[in-house]
């Protein structure tokens, strides 16, 4: 499912090439609106901002409540997505992180939960992923070292520019 026709056409080609045309149906849909509650066991919501991921789950709550699991890969606002999930009846049961073409992508498998898990996560765990931290995920460690290096470079520039205006262009170049 996708809200745009182009990605559906490309997905249909991949499905056909994989010989899965009978098992996979394509639908043009805004979020989960073209699904009925109980129609599917799982969804993948990936390749979009965290705000949109949260909106899809909120607007499609009737469907989301009947899912056995969701695979999520938000590309921004990761901590907000984790907090939203934990406050809205989901438990994060698995986390992964990959590096592709210089960009870090966290992913999570979530399942419905009867109780709020929010109080079990501190701010660091929300930001970087409790399960990723617990497993000392090698890609997370690489990401943290990169962040440390970028922040050190910014601090060094600030030290050298004492009395000069701060270059916001330089700071923006280091945003993730």
Where are these regions (language model features)?
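Short SAM/SAH-binding signature in class I
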Residues: 40-46
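C-terminal substrate-binding/active-site "lid" region of AdoMet-derived donor-dependent transferases
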Residues: 63-106
